[in-house]
Curated annotation (Swiss-Prot):
It comes from Phleum pratense (Common timothy). The modification Phosphothreonine is found at residue 111. This is Profilin-8. Coiled coil: none annotated. Phosphorylated by MAP kinases.
Length: 131
């Protein structure tokens, strides 16, 4: 299965009548492996900050997480594995695998839990595949 198929079929899938606003699979260096049409472009320093938070959980909490210059308040995640952020009525979930970052961005009416489920399910699958 291509990386684009993972995005199209597993991240942008319908969950209880709702979809993520955008999604992508990135390399740890920020290289885009596949993305949805509306996925924002990360800046290199944003990827650096995200990767540092995986290595040093809590790094982003004081300043927030920036994605394409949009600021997200970092909320409870799983240290070293998942970063979650909130911005207004929407948010973001980032799951780290051995080689990739699985990213989902949502807006209402999708819930944080639905976003977490979609992103983390694919991330867990990729981890089991050694990716």
């Amino acid at each position: 299965m291509s990386w684009q198929a993972y995005v199209d079929e597993h991240l942008m899938c319908e969950i209880e009548g709702h979809h993520l606003a955008s999604a992508a699979i990135l390399g740890h260096d920020g290289t885009v492996w596949a993305q949805s049409a509306d996925f924002p472009q990360f800046k290199p320093e944003e990827i650096t900050g995200i990767m540092k938070d995986f290595d040093e959980p809590g790094h982003l909490a004081p300043t927030g997480m920036f994605v394409a210059a949009a600021k997200y308040m970092v909320i409870q995640g799983e240290p070293g594995a998942v970063i979650r952020g909130k911005k207004g009525a929407g948010g973001i979930t980032i799951k780290k695998t051995g080689q990739a970052l699985v990213v989902g961005i949502y807006d209402e009416p999708m819930t944080p839990g639905q976003c977490n489920m979609v992103v983390e399910r694919l991330g867990d699958y990729l981890l089991k595949q050694g990716l």
